[in-house]
């Protein structure tokens, strides 16, 4: 009572553990002691339907949460507090599982068709959940501007659409341009972006692919690329966040917005707590000259997938077409462009000199090479931001 509605995915996360346990135990008649023994057997591997070496405490916690929900709702002999609950300690993510630039490129090369490469790059460069990717419609994506919005009609996105502004496609832009050449029907904007692979059989673009299809695609890519690290959709989500924080130092709220978490979410302090420690040590060693700084960007390709121009290691955007590869570059570019628009609003149209200054800056930023140089120079970007702020204050 008073808890409000729950997403279908959340309900399923409770139902599945209950269904599993109900195969061996009558949950209506079970005692608290019996349930504790069952949970212990899961951990040691003695319980049916689990692997021989057992399951981790973090997984057993899902069963504990489901049981507590069940017994809180039903008035049986077992109370919710009779079920122990393992505490969440540390990050569930192993930093060693994060993909290197070379492994990202291996995975991309292993995707042997345009549809599968589009799926992979959407997961890699947006950090979105599988459900969000498979339900994107053509009208949710602006290829020209390299942005997308989540489909607001979809249930099960865990509130991600509550902050549903434009998000960057980054390196997925060129891949999607290529995929749309093969898409079965781009005339209807209501059609789904990702469809079944075009073949001799008819493809219905008005129906989304199954979540299992996305999992299978990443599994096949992992196998063909010979990558030992996790490559399932949720692992790629963790990969995106880790890179955004570790390599590009994006603010927590920016990262949470990009992946669809609420502003007050604690995900950065829990799931991604592994981003402290070793990463801070590495930066300190670089500052003192003990360690050579990394000059490559994990999300920067060797060749731009929009215009096929060779890209310098560590470049944030293509010097020829202006395609943005890294999340920090997109944020910086968006800040400058927003500042220019605000300057137009705040400036008196009769103030010819100021209008000419703003137009000159806007024209310069249309040059991809100039924009790329600006994005690589943090001091210049800071000065531009300060100038924009001063101009808005003065007006």
Please name every model-derived segment.
Residues 123-145, 251-254:
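Short, charged phosphate-coordinating catalytic segments
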Residues 237-261, 357-360, 370, 380:
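C-terminal catalytic core of tyrosine-transesterase DNA break-rejoin enzymes
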Residues 141-143, 229, 249-271:
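Short, polar N-cap/turn motifs at the start of nucleic acid-interacting alpha helices
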């Amino acid at each position: 009572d008073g808890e409000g509605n729950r997403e279908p995915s959340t309900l399923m996360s409770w139902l599945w553990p209950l269904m599993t346990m109900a195969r061996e135990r009558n949950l209506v008649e079970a005692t608290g002691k019996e349930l504790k023994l069952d949970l212990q057997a899961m951990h040691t591997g003695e319980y049916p339907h689990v692997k021989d070496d057992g399951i981790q405490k973090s997984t057993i916690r899902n069963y504990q949460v489901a049981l507590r929900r069940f017994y809180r709702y039903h008035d049986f002999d077992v109370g919710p507090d009779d079920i122990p609950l393992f505490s969440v300690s540390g990050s569930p993510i192993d930093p060693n599982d994060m993909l290197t630039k070379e492994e990202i490129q291996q995975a991309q090369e292993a995707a042997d068709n345009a549809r599968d490469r589009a799926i992979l790059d959407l997961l890699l460069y947006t950090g979105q959940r599988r459900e969000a990717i498979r339900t994107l419609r053509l009208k949710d994506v602006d290829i020209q501007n390299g942005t997308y919005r989540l489909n607001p009609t979809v249930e099960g996105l865990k509130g991600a659409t509550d902050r549903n502004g434009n998000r960057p496609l980054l390196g997925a832009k060129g891949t999607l341009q290529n995929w749309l050449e093969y898409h079965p029907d781009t005339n209807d904007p209501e059609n789904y972006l990702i469809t079944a692979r075009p073949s001799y059989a008819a493809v219905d673009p008005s129906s989304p692919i199954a979540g299992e299809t996305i999992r299978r695609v990443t599994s096949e890519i992992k196998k063909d690329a010979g990558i030992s690290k996790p490559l399932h959709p949720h692992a790629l989500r963790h990969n995106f966040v880790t890179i955004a924080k570790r390599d590009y130092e994006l603010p927590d709220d920016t990262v949470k917005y990009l992946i669809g978490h609420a502003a007050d979410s604690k995900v950065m302090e829990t799931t991604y707590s592994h981003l402290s420690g070793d990463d801070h040590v590495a930066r300190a060693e670089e500052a003192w000259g003990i360690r050579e700084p990394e000059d490559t960007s994990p999300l920067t390709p060797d060749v731009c997938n929009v215009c096929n121009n060779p890209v310098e290691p560590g470049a944030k955007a293509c010097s020829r077409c202006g395609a943005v590869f890294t999340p920090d570059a997109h944020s910086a570019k968006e800040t400058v462009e927003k500042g220019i628009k605000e300057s137009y609003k705040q400036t008196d149209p009769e103030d010819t000199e100021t209008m000419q200054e703003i137009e000159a800056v806007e024209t310069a930023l249309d040059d991809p090479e100039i924009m790329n140089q600006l994005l690589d120079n943090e001091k210049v970007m800071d000065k531009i931001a300060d100038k924009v702020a001063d101009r808005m204050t003065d007006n």
